[in-house]
Amino acid sequence: MPKHGKKYKEVLKLVDKQKNYDIDEALDLVKKTSYTKFDGTVELHVLLGIDPKKGDQNVRGTVSLPKGTGKNVRVLVFAEGEKAAQAKQAGADFVGSDDLIEKINNEGWTDFDVAIATPDIMRKIGRLGKVLGPRGLMPSPKAGTVTDDVAQAVKEFKAGKVEVRNDRTGNIHIPIGKVSFDKDDLKENLISAFDQLTKMKPENSKGKFIRKAVIASTMGPGINIDLSSLSLSSVA
C-alpha cells in the first residue's frame, strides 16, 4: 500500500468513510479535499454488479460529458484521402496512415489521448495492438472510434466524450471534470455520466448494477456517494 503524506492525512479528517454523502455534499467535499498545486481531475469510480471474468458481462462504451473534461484532448485519426481532409478540418491533432502506423510501431509513440480509424484502415493497424492495446488507445467500434464519420467523432471526443470500460475488479473509472469546475458543472457531468452508465448494463448481469460509487480528486481521498440522491432507476 502506498504511504500517504501529511497533506493527505489532513484532508482525510474531513471525510467520514462510513458515511454516504448526497451528491451536493460529496462535490463540496471533493473540492475541499483537493490539495495538489495543479488543477486536479475529479474522477468517478463505480463498482458494477458484474462478473468481469465473464466476457458477456464486461462493460465498454462511451460517455459524453455535457460540460467537457477540462482537458485538451489530443486526437489522432488513421485515415486517407477525403476522410483525412475531413479529420483535419474537424480539428484532429494528428492525421495520417502508413506514416503514423510506422511511427507508433517503430518508436512506441503514443503522445495522444484518443485514436480514431476508418474501417478500411483497421486491417493495417492490427499490428499496433501490442502498443495501443495496453494503453487503451486501440480503435474499437464499441468505443465509437472505428467510423467513417471521422469529423463527427473528432468533434465529440474534443467536446468531452470519453471511453469507459470496467477493470478486472468490476470497477469503472470516469473523469468528470477538473477541481476548478463550478460545482453545478461537475454535478451535471456526474448525473449525465450515471444516466449513460446505467444504460450499459449487460443482459447477463443480474440484480443491482450500480453497487457503489465514489468520487475523488487527483491524490485526494475517496468520498462515498449516496446512490439514492441520484434518483436512478438502475441503481436498485
Swiss-Prot record:
CC per GO annotation: large ribosomal subunit
Any single biological process term in GO: regulation of translation
GO molecular function: rRNA binding; structural constituent of ribosome; tRNA binding
InterPro entries per record: Ribosom_uL1_bac-type, Ribosomal_uL1, Ribosomal_uL1-like, Ribosomal_uL1/biogenesis, Ribosomal_uL1_3-a/b-sand, Ribosomal_uL1_CS
Keywords: Repressor, Ribonucleoprotein, Ribosomal protein, RNA-binding, rRNA-binding, Translation regulation, tRNA-binding
Top-level taxon: Bacteria
Keyword Cell cycle: no
Pfam family, one: Ribosomal_L1
Role noted for this protein: Binds directly to 23S rRNA. The L1 stalk is quite mobile in the ribosome, and is involved in E site tRNA release. Protein L1 is also a translational repressor protein, it controls the translation of the L11 operon by binding to its mRNA.
Record note on quaternary structure: Part of the 50S ribosomal subunit.
Family: Belongs to the universal ribosomal protein uL1 family.
Protein name: Large ribosomal subunit protein uL1
Organism: Petrotoga mobilis (strain DSM 10674 / SJ95)
